[in-house]
Amino acid sequence: MTNLKLTTIFVLFFCINIIGFIDRHLLSAFGSQIVAELDLTRQQFGLLTGFAFVAVYALSGPVMGVLADRHNPAKVVTVGVLVWSLMTAISGRATSFFTMLAPRMLVGVGEATLHPSATSIFTKWSGVGSRSTIFSLFFLGGHVGVGLAYWLAGTFGDTLGWRQLFLLLGSVGLLFCIPLWLFVAPLVARSNQTNDKPLVSRPSVTQIVSDLRHLLVSSTRFRIAVLGFALVHVLYATNQFMQLWLSSERGLADYEAASVYGAVYLTVAIPAGLLGGLMADLFIRYFRTTKYLFLVIVLLASGPLLIALRYATIDTPLFQIGLVASVFMITFPYGAMFAAVIEEVPARIQASGTGFILFACNVLVIGGVTWGVGALSDYFQTTGLTQPLSRALSIGDAMTLLAIPCFWWLHRHQTQMMQITQPANDAMTDSNSEQK
């Protein structure tokens, strides 16, 4: 496999990842318009942007992973892109909550094929030393996609409207099926036939489930790490309401709200996503400490700005800084956070551990909290409270900050373990030196 072909395949998957995240967040970017046109409650909107998509996406992920392992992963993702692109186009014809709900759920099924299939292909065709870079760049496409969703809604929503953009996005997705099926799938098939990178023997499904269950029961560190990781993902859920919040309670025009948030997201997320992992590694090496302390410092520095955002008026610097913090807080520490949590999982079941972690974040947190914020906002509105969405989002922000004590406990525990093991390691080093 030549470097040119590998680069072409990577760029193709990178672009598909961008398309997937645009599709995932375009509904949120047009929140106020879709809520008004389809006569949705905020609870229903929270279901569409959260649980309806996320639950199906997370539950389908393990199944798609098995299919990608047993069959040609390029063909699996081609079918997935075909399904989600068609459903995206159909979403543009929705006339009610239920006619939007069904295609959004099927979009989740289709998009669940991408990451397992891409992981299968990239792992087989890349060396260990380059995988971190490859996956960091690949997941960067998600940040680009989120920002582009809001930018597209703000820039072209007024002229094209949300229905036409959904149809256009679905059409673009369908075009990617052609090179996937005709170019990537044959290359994957030939690579498997020549056994350039033979598969390693894997434990049985029963053994994997048993090991994962044992990890959950026996490892307090793993449970707290997953809890902290999941709590930070509450910010993903609250950010689903950003366009709706900016337009309904901060006075921005619908398309201006989407455009402003899209511009901020792109400006902050790309450099933050690229530099966060590098800064974490430098911090750990320089201070000889843990990743968890880095996470605590980042969350402590940006958390108060997030809380202040909900109460700042739109013409103040505090509002602008808070808006930046809402993006920075999830994108800058994400690489270090994921690496820290996955290090709590034994190497033999890291793929299954990753699946469980993402399931917990997507279904229990992003899906559940998105629905909860919408329902709470509706309740506050019925009681006559002012700024009901701001109040509901503030509760979500407070939940995000509960990750800080989780990461602090993990830092203290890991530091104590290092202090216990370091003298033993030093003694062993001295003994080896004397023998020499």
Locate the predicted segments by residue.
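Extracytoplasmic gate region of multi-pass secondary transporters
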Residues: 28, 220-269, 273-274, 334, ...
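Extracellular/periplasmic helix-loop-helix junction of adjacent transmembrane segments
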Residues: 30-59
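Helix-loop-helix hairpin linking two adjacent transmembrane segments in secondary transporters
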Residues: 138-188
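Cytoplasmic membrane-interface "Motif A"-like loop-to-helix N-cap segments
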Residues: 70-80, 282-298
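Juxtamembrane intracellular "pre-TM" segments in multi-pass secondary transporters
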Residues: 2, 188-224, 249
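Conserved MFS/SLC helix-loop-helix module at the cytosolic interface between two early adjacent transmembrane helices
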Residues: 59-95
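Cytoplasmic helix-loop-helix junction between adjacent transmembrane helices
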Residues: 103-142
